[in-house]
C-alpha cells in the first residue's frame, strides 16, 4: 500500500526530531516546534520548576498548566474557522491554551485499527458541508510489537502487514468521499526502531560517585543530574566507558536542537550508542525489551517513512 502511495504521490526517508520518541515527535509534527521549544522533552522528564517527575502517560500530569507549549495545528485550524477531527493523536485530548479540536478521541487500545479507519472514513464521507478540513489519526503499531519482539521479528513483520491491510481498506473506502480528489494524504511515522539485546547493557551506578548524583531520568536519552562540581568528572567517566555520548545540556551539538529548555532537562544528557541500554540500579537488570528508539536521530535505524 505504501509503495502504491509513493508511486501516486511522493515519498522520502526522513529523520525525526530529537529525542526520537513517541510524544516528543508527535507533538513536534503537530506544532512545528522542536521538543526543546514545545516542552515535551521526552515521554518522561523531571521539571525543576514543579519539583517532580512528569509523564505523558499520567492523565493528571498532561493537564497541568504549561505542560504543553506551542500551538498544535488543530488549534491553528480552528482559529481560522476550519474544523478539525483528531483521533488519538498525542496531545489532542487535553485543552491547550483553552482550546481543542471540534472532535477529538482519547487514546484507547480497545478499538481495532479497522474501527479507527472507519472513524476517518465516516468523517470524510459526510455531505460536503459537514466534512472536516483537518483529520489526524494515530496507530501505536507496529511500535508496540517491535518493543516486545524486536524490529526484525516475525511478529513485527506480521503486525506491519496487518497495518498495511488496514491502510489498503482505508484508501479503498475513502474514495467514496465527495471531496476525495481534493484531499491531501500524509502517511508518516514518529521514529524508527533499533534492536536491543541483554549483552548491550551498561549500569551507570557502579561507574559514578553516587553521593554526587542528585537524580536520574531513565530512558533514551538518559538524564543525569549531578552536583555542578562533579559534572565534568562524570562526563569524562561516561565518555571513557564507551558506547555512549555525554554532554552538559548547554553543550549538546546544535544539530540536536536539544538542551535549552529552562526547567525540564538534567544537567547531563547521555545518548547511548544505538542498540545499547543504559541503567542506574543497585543490581544489574535483565533487558527485557527487544527494541526501542530515542537514539541519535541521524542514525538510520531511527529514520522513518514519509
Q: How would you label these PLM feature ranges?
A:
Residues 178, 182-183, 189-229:
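Acidic/histidine-rich catalytic neighborhood
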Residues 216-306:
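Active-site neighborhoods of enzymes that stabilize oxyanions during catalysis
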Residues 1-37:
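Short, structured active-site-proximal loop/turn typified by the sulfatase FGly-forming signature C/S-X-P-X-R
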Residues 1, 111-125, 142-183:
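A long, amphipathic alpha-helix that forms part
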Residues 12-15, 28-30, 75-76, 83-88, ...:
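Structural recognition of the beta-strand scaffold that forms the well-ordered cores
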Residues 8-10, 79-85, 129-135, 179-184, ...:
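Loop/turn elements at helix/coil->beta-strand transitions in domains of secreted/extracellular proteins
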Residues 33-151, 242, 279-280:
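His/Asp/Glu-rich, glycine-adjacent segments
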Amino acid at each position: 500500500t505504501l509503495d502504491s502511495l509513493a508511486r501516486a504521490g511522493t515519498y522520502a526517508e526522513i529523520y525525526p526530531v530529537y529525542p526520537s520518541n513517541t510524544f516528543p515527535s508527535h507533538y513536534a509534527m503537530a506544532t512545528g516546534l522542536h521538543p526543546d521549544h514545545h516542552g515535551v522533552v521526552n515521554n518522561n522528564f523531571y521539571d525543576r520548576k514543579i519539583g517532580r517527575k512528569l509523564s505523558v502517560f499520567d492523565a493528571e500530569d498532561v493537564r497541568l498548566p504549561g505542560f504543553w507549549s506551542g500551538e498544535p495545528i488543530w488549534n491553528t485550524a480552528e482559529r481560522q474557522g476550519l474544523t478539525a477531527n483528531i483521533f488519538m493523536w498525542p496531545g489532542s485530548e487535553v485543552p491547550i491554551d483553552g482550546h481543542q479540536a471540534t472532535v477529538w478521541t482519547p487514546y484507547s487500545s480497545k478499538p481495532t485499527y479497522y474501527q479507527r479507519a472507519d472513524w476517518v472514513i465516516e468523517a470524510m464521507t459526510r455531505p460536503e458541508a459537514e466534512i472536516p478540513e483537518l483529520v489526524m489519526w494515530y496507530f501505536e503499531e507496529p511500535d508496540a510489537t517491535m518493543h516486545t519482539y524486536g524490529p526484525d521479528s516475525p511478529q513485527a513483520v506480521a503486525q506491519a502487514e496487518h497495518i498495511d491491510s488496514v491502510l489498503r481498506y482505508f484508501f479503498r473506502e475513502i474514495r467514496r468521499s465527495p471531496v476525495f480528489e481534493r484531499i491531501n494524504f500524509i502517511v508518516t511515522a514518529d521514529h524508527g526502531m533499533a534492536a536491543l539485546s541483554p549483552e548491550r547493557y551498561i549500569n551507570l551506578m557502579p561507574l559514578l560517585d553516587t553521593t554526587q548524583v542528585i537524580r536520574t531520568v531513565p530512558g533514551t536519552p538518559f538524564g543525569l543530574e549531578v552536583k555542578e562540581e562533579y559534572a565534568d568528572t562524570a562526563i569524562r567517566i561516561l565518555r571513557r566507558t564507551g558506547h555512549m555520548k555525554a554532554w552538559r545540556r548547554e553543550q549538546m551539538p546544535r544539530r540536536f536542537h536539544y538542551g535549552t529548555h529552562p526547567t525540564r532537562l538534567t544537567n547531563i544528557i547521555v545518548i547511548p550508542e544505538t542498540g545499547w541500554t543504559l541503567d542506574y540500579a543497585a543490581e544489574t537488570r535483565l533487558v527485557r525489551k527487544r527494541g526501542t528508539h530515542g537514539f541519535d536521530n541521524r542514525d538510520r535505524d531511527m529514520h522513518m517513512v514519509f
